[in-house]
Amino acid sequence: MKLRKHMISRVLPDSIAEELGLEPGDRLVSVNGQPVEDVFDYRYLMNEELVVLLVEKPDGEEWELEVEKEYEEDLGIEFENGGLMDDYRSCSNKCMFCFIDQMPPDMRETLYFKDDDSRLSFLQGNYVTLTNMSEKDIERVIRYHLEPINISFQAMNPELRCKMLHNRFAGKALEKVDMLYNAGITMNGQIVLCKGVNDGDELEYSLEKLSAYAPVLQSVSVVPVGLTKYRKGLYPLEPFNKEDAEKVLSQIQRWQKIMMEKYGIHFIHASDEWYILADRELPYEDEYDGYLQLENGVGMLRLLETEVKETLEGLSGDDRKVTGRIATGKLAAPFITRYIKEIQKKYPNVQIPVTTIENRFFGEKITVSGLITGQDLKEQLSGLDLGEKLLIPCSMLKGDEEIFLDDMTLKELSEALKTEIVIVDTGGRDLVEAVINPPKHKPTRRRQIYEQTSSSDSGKAECRQIHSV
């Protein structure tokens, strides 16, 4: 078999790799005489105190480098393909609820890529369906003990799962869960709930089946399907209402009691949307079992509130004058307004009203901040008094780039609105500091291997923490 040679795209300053004389454009050929298929092999082979690298320079010269380091110390090398060291595996399903299928045409190409790659599950926390994982893939996960693996279950009824994923192998793919469970590989799960499809009795069946995998399967989130206005020709799905949400929460809470008695964990978690839709208070912090499902919007609002309060406890407050405005999605707006009032108790002259942005681009049913476009911000904020600064969450932007989903740049929006725009990171401290301090431009710090809005498996989506600001 021909050895794969992996192009080095970046060498970090003051790293071991820089000391060795490695440069962008060099190619890694092998580690300890072993070929490197992808990032899994690389990370596994690098977990040694003594490693021998075979590197090919651009002129074809080969260097053999012996490196002594700490066991898990990184060399400081970044590779092409965002560090995956291989092509991305696209999704082989056609899920009835896939968000990418609900997007308008003519957006940037990377937004239409659907992943279903177990390696991204390990590296980034993306959720995978297991339908395109081979036995070899499972064996590698077990051999390298790569965990946690995040799985999009949707339904434990094999026939229904095949229907929902539009993949005749989707039911049989659940057998791979048994292999991971028997090997002790930690897992997290997700169910995208579709009204009249996998809710009610089907959800009950799924929760019962999934509970048997606890505590190796350490958590399962239940999230409502996201529906845009671009669903022509797709499976007819309906949004959940208040009564539906109350039933879902009652069902989940009953299972939480069962799992607490048996394992001491809540195990099943409802995303924040369900509580808002049902007009119920969010659970207490200890009910989230350490916030294992933040990326699915489980507990993000509670955590943000906790962090805001903790940050304010360490501040004495003063009479500084600050003006501005916060723009956020419909889902988070009432909570952000509440947090601003807490800040004003210590900083009474801070005037930062919250503006709820309606998602006209994707449709009013989309209420999360991370799917708001620059055009919607421009249209709905023009003419308003924005004060010294406009605060927006990093979730609105593409990873570590200052560009919105509709390709409007942060600079273009700032010029159109004639104001400084401050990017707020996801933590409560970040929110407090952004509110009480003068405008200071700070680029978003989040990074990702590749761009994705939200595929059928609702993996990490750019910087799309859906409840941040």
Labelled PLM ranges:
Residues 196-197, 217-243, 263-286, 359-364, ...:
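Flexible glycine/acidic-rich beta-alpha junction loops that bind and position SAM and/or redox cofactors
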Residues 449-469:
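Conserved G1/Walker A P-loop phosphate-binding module
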Residues 148-150, 186-188, 219-221, 267-269, ...:
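Structural preference for beta-strand elements that scaffold enzyme active sites
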Residues 60-62, 69-216, 226-255:
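Conserved Radical SAM active-site core
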Residues 7, 279-447:
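Radical SAM enzyme core and accessory elements
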Residues 1-12:
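PDZ/PDZ-like groove recognition
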Residues 19-37:
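Conserved PDZ fold ligand-binding element
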Residues 17, 25-28, 53, 98:
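Terminal peptide-recognition signature
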